[in-house]
Amino acid sequence: DGYYNGYYSDDYADVYINGQYPMKMAEILTQRVETHRDSKGHTHTTTTTIFSGIFAKINMKKSINCQIRIKEDGVFYNGNINMDSTQFEKYFDVDCSDKVITMQLLTHDVMDMLINFRKILGAPFDILIVNNVMYIRLHVGKVFESVINKYLAVDVGTVKRYYNIIDFLDTISKELIKNIENTEI
């Protein structure tokens, strides 16, 4: 989404989807740090956050031989493909290099799933599939920190949020992988 010169990573995990598709994920923070001098010679630093959240990469066995990008609505100026769901179009834009494969993979079930997770997470996310690699970015900020509050009790809201993030990554990756495996490419 833009140039960055500050990169930080935390909470790295290396897991398998369905026991066979490797997923690497971590909490990522990318920032653009710019230093400049004003007319009086004072140095000022401006830090702009480019991305803060979870980034996941999943290697799949089958290639779609194209690229599909799903982003927040308005990013692609309505994308280059119109989907069959007006509700989906309210939340997302889709840009792709093969409209037929994109329509086969983004079924009504997948679109409904993406809409529901967008509402549950309360944060935007992006999905990029390039050939046999799927990338997922969740713009959720800093996560997976201690869930004990000042009263030494488990913060149920935070635990639920963390569960929803993991559930999204697991559910959507499994569904898209299933559709890819079942699609004639």
Language-model features, listed with the residues they occupy:
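Charged, low-complexity intrinsically disordered regions
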Residues: 1-185
